[in-house]
């Protein structure tokens, strides 16, 4: 299976068969975030049943082999800032802005209407 044929959650799971169960769960949860919405590392950790594993979520997303199909750019810190190295954070900011998310002073103002 190649990246261009991935359309469904099942496709993502099949493509990620070489990842750990935790990494697969994180990437599948991230795959579900719709355009124009964001989530946080903590919320993803909670969704996959590991509420204190938000740093592990960030680590799994850093190794995302399916970007932008699995839109890791839509996952931010709980304070609305973009995690990771500045160069990667800037690229993620640009992608999120193109999707219609408002950024003020380098961070997203997290509200219920954009939170997934």
PLM regions: where:
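Nucleic acid-binding interface residues in structured DNA/RNA-binding domains
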Residues: 3-116
